């Protein structure tokens, strides 16, 4: 999974600066994963970027960041899960060679890749899909609420919804 994340980061275009991830899809697939990654992207306002390596596949959607808080404050947030520190966010971003400055700013946005890595750590799954509803900032406590095979991650508002299968 990390190799596909790095491949997507290497595909970076300057005009994508400041955009936020709206969706991440990952599939381990079966069979051989050797060989180079194939990268493709399309779109102008909403950017779809795909990386394929052997049977593994990752796709993300990038959207312009509006800066607006969307959604109501959540009363039942679930159980505390994680609080990403500024240093943790910046280090993860640098290790992936993620060029988006929003992960290095004075109040860094937690990378969707970092959320995916933390959610899947130590878990056995074949597919992952995360919809990002609101940026999560370093220093904000994240609470998880599970409903079936879905995890809802919230700070004050719903930040992401993840499904692992």
Name each region found by the language model:
Residues 1-30, 96-127:
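Active-site helix/loop of acyl-thioester processing domains in fatty-acid/polyketide metabolism
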Residues 75-108:
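A contiguous, surface-exposed recognition patch within enzymatic or periplasmic domains that forms
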Residues 1-81, 136-165:
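HotDog/MaoC-like acyl-thioester-processing domains
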Residues 92, 131-133, 159-160:
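Aromatic-residue hotspot detector
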Residues 123-141:
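A conserved acidic, glycine/proline-rich C-terminal tail/linker
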